[in-house]
UniProtKB/Swiss-Prot annotation:
Membrane topology field: Single-pass membrane protein
Pfam families reported for this sequence: CBS, PB1
Protein name per UniProt: CBS domain-containing protein CBSCBSPB1
Segments of skewed composition (Basic and acidic residues): 23-35
Stretches that traverse the bilayer: 518-538
Highest rank taxon of the organism: Eukaryota
Organism name: Arabidopsis thaliana
Protein keywords: CBS domain, Membrane, Phosphoprotein, Repeat, Transmembrane, Transmembrane helix
């Protein structure tokens, strides 16, 4: 792995130092490249302060560990039963000696036509997988994972592998912060333009600067990260698993899209080979892809914002997302690491204004995204053991932070928009709405904001307490997102409002005009805060 962000100290750890509890070892996954051969681990830089987050404070998971003498078939069965796509291997002394992933199964086993019931995993595993120490800075470990393009990394403490770091979980935390920052930035730009129009003046900020904020940071689409020469592995539903596995090696891809009559009808990944073929003991040379593929997979278009693509994969719990053009032809398949790298690079390009040249774009992103806010310090009150290894049976929270929630809204062109916002402030939600459907909003007739409850009633959101009550109710019935509606009809005096105090089910009728005035006040507050923030931004960067 290439070093980033300045010099690092490293410590080579032999497998002999990894003695201890076999059951405490955690899974690691080799990425798409083959660079994870060294057992070198990076230590945290000197001068670590209490405010900097270390690896052991990130989301960690359990893993599966088996002897290297285990047959490939048995290993795959174990992985399938635990619903994991990688496992660690130990030698006769119970020392960590390798790792096996679903990609290894596809490219090193099936494509090579090995006998899975006779071949031990030691023949196809990646030896000496990379890992990090528990005191390593979180930003350093995450940065290395993105650059190296692998999702899982074992975490070592006192010579034992104690946990697994999954970059996908950490990524969504960081992206949620980046998205909120982007939303605030767009509100800043909009506020400045509004002042110019109202006062008939022109600030010292060139329009090109505002356009840069919009185009490079706030609205980058997948089309900006997909090369023109991208090759997509397209197969027929009647192709055999063996044929597709060989093509995966040829295309250096971990997935294939299944096309019927020029339309996307399925997706087949290396994880499917592991879970649905090998673990089920199906013959690859006789099994047709159409019997083991994921049918009618979710896809998106090239104009989809990068952050939106990440949300789609996160909510759908999959790692590959087909991308189509306007005609519906698949032009690319992006994975979570690919999109992450692009999102970080895009954010870093803009955020790098005025910063030291020695910092890399990814380092800036992780440093900013993982920085602790005052109320996050409460996380330290949790037990250290629960921070180290999270139970696989634990579902966990649906959202990256206790004070955030997911929202959906549809514009007048029937396009759906999804965003995550702070649940403590209606101003934050309004800012996000303006960002996405601002063209639908008449500034002289600001709409009411409503949400749809489980009875399909439209309930008013007119204050911070209304918002908090709505979120509490949504969580209590197991919802992961709240569907919002805008009503600019100035009719419907019978709209209902859920009170934050008292019974969660209590409702009261309110006058529409009164709440319209409240919305106007909130909107004015959002513009004022945004304008002040923009001026501070200009002073900081010398514009």
């Amino acid at each position: 792995m290439a070093s980033q962000g300045g010099p690092r100290r490293s410590l080579s750890v032999t497998t002999a130092s990894l003695h201890g509890k076999k059951k405490s070892m955690d899974m690691a996954e080799r990425g798409l490249d083959t660079g994870r051969r060294s057992l070198t681990v990076s230590r945290s830089p000197l001068g670590l302060t209490g405010g900097e987050r270390t690896v052991k404070r990130l989301r960690l998971s359990k893993a599966l560990t088996v002897p290297a003498t285990t047959t490939i078939y048995e290993a795959c069965k174990r992985m399938a039963s635990r619903r994991v796509d990688a496992l660690l291997l130990t030698d006769s002394n119970e020392m960590l000696c390798g790792i096996l992933t679903d990609k290894d199964i596809a490219t090193r086993v099936i494509s090579q036509e090995l006998n899975v019931e006779e071949t031990p995993v030691s023949k196809v595993m990646t030896k000496n997988p990379m890992f990090v120490l528990s005191e390593t800075l979180a930003v350093e470990a995450l940065q290395k994972m993105v650059q190296g393009k692998f999702r899982h990394l074992p975490v070592v403490e006192n010579g034992e592998v104690i946990a697994l770091l999954d970059i996908a979980k950490c990524l969504y935390d960081a992206i949620a912060r980046m998205e909120r920052a982007a939303e605030k930035g767009k509100a800043i730009a909009a506020a400045v333009e509004g002042v110019e129009k109202s006062w008939g003046t022109n600030t010292s900020v060139p329009n090109t600067f505002i356009e840069t904020l919009r185009d490079r940071m706030f609205r980058p689409s997948l089309s900006t990260i997909i090369p023109d020469d991208t090759k997509v592995l397209k197969v027929s539903p009647t192709d055999t698993v063996l044929t597709v596995a060989k093509k995966m090696v040829e295309f250096q891809s971990s997935c294939a899209v299944v096309i019927i009559e020029d339309k996307l009808r399925g997706i087949f990944t290396s994880k499917d080979i592991l879970m649905r073929v090998v673990a089920e003991n199906l013959p690859p040379s006789e099994t047709l892809v159409e019997t083991v593929m994921t049918q009618n997979p979710e896809s998106t278009i090239v104009d989809t914002p990068i952050v939106e693509a990440l949300h789609i994969m996160h909510e759908g719990k999959f790692l590959h997302l087909p991308v189509t053009d306007k005609e519906g032809d698949v032009v690319a398949v992006v994975d979570v690491i690919h999109v992450t790298h692009a999102a970080v690079a895009t954010a870093g390009t803009t955020a790098g204004i005025g910063n030291e040249a020695t910092n890399t774009m990814m380092q800036k992103f992780w440093d900013s995204a993982m920085a602790l806010s005052p109320n996050e310090d409460d996380e330290d009150s949790r037990s250290e053991s629960s921070m180290k290894v999270a139970s696989e049976a634990e579902t966990g929270k649906s959202f990256p932070f206790a004070n955030t929630f997911s929202f959906k809204i549809e514009d007048k062109k029937h396009r759906k928009h999804r965003f995550i916002s702070d649940t403590r402030s209606l101003t934050e939600v309004i800012t996000a709405i303006i960002q996405r459907v601002g063209d639908d909003i008449d500034p002289d007739n600001f709409p009411q904001i409503l949400y749809e409850d489980e009875d399909h009633d439209k309930v008013l959101l007119a204050s911070d307490s209304d918002l908090q009550a709505a979120i509490e109710h949504a969580k209590s019935i197991g919802w992961k997102s709240l569907r919002l509606h805008l009503d600019d009809s100035r009719e419907g005096k019978g709209r209902r409002r859920r009170r934050a105090s008292g019974s969660a089910e209590s409702m009261e009728y309110v006058e529409t005009d009164a709440w319209a005035a409240a919305y106007s006040g909130v909107a004015a507050g959002a513009a004022l805060v945004a304008g002040l923030g923009f001026m501070a931004f200009l002073r900081k960067f010398g514009h």
